A protein has these predicted regions:
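Intrinsically disordered, compositionally biased repeat/linker segments
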Residues: 1-256
């Protein structure tokens, strides 16, 4: 059946459980959210949370076999230990501060994952494992910070924004995929690694560079670096059995 909660404080508090075989779950209001220990388990359903503070806080879980999960609002975020496991689904996070915070996990067999907003990023310990999916991160400060990992069998990874880059120990490892990083200072910093069997790697921006100890080992790939100072600095390596390597810009060079 359909389940609807509407009021100024439409929330599920401690120990609440909604279990149904088939249903539509709508939570709307000034503070429409699922708090600690909340569970909404259903075989098939659409889950919509809207409001000024529509978010899932610590230890939130929405398990479903098939479903569409939409979270919108001014502060739409997953806080610590947020988990959305599902067999098939579309996961959309939009808002001014649409991001995954500490220990966020989105695991599904097939899905489309879109995070948009002014500060759409993955912070420490973020993981998005999926068999097949499209991963899009857009915003003013779209970055992967330390220890970010996005393992997937097949996927397209797009990072764009003012400072779209991979910083220390950032890793994107997949079997097949297209990797696009664009923005003002688009670069791989110390320890940046992109490992893939097949892939197309495109880096565009004013400062699209590989800095010290950058490495991109692939079997087959197209590598394009464009920008005003598009170059490989010392210690940088691009190794591949077959590939097209294009470096363009005002100072497109490989340094010592």
């Amino acid at each position: 059946g359909p389940f609807a909660w509407t009021c100024n404080d439409a929330t599920l508090k401690k120990g609440r459980t909604i279990a149904a075989g088939v249903g539509v779950f709508n939570l709307t209001g000034q503070a429409a959210g699922i708090n600690k220990g909340r569970t909404m388990a259903a075989g098939t359903g659409a889950y919509t949370l809207t409001g000024n503070a529509a978010l899932i806080e610590a230890a939130r879980s929405l398990p479903a076999g098939t479903g569409v999960f939409t979270l919108t609002g001014n502060t739409v975020a997953f806080n610590s230990e947020a988990n959305l496991p599902g067999g098939t689904g579309s996961f959309i996070f939009t808002g001014n501060n649409a991001g995954l915070r500490v220990s966020r996990l989105l695991s599904s067999g097939v899905g489309s994952f879109t995070l948009t907003g002014n500060a759409a990023n993955l912070n420490r310990g973020k993981s998005m494992p999926a068999g097949a999916g499209v991963f899009t991160f857009t915003g003013n400060a779209v970055t992967f910070l330390r220890g970010r990992v996005m393992p997937a069998g097949v996927g397209a990874f797009t990072l764009s924004g003012q400072s779209a880059g991979l910083r220390k120990a950032s890793i994107i490892g997949i079997n097949a995929g297209a990797y696009t990083l664009s923005g003002e200072p688009v670069d791989f910093r110390i320890g940046g690694v992109l490992v893939a069997g097949h892939g197309s790697f495109v880096f565009t921006g004013n400062a699209a560079t590989f800095r010290a100890t950058r490495q991109m080992p692939v079997t087959v790939g197209v590598f394009v670096l464009t920008g005003n100072p598009a170059g490989l600095l010392n210690g940088n390596k691009l190794s591949g059995d077959a590939g097209a390597f294009v470096l363009t810009g005002n100072a497109a060079a490989i340094y010592v």
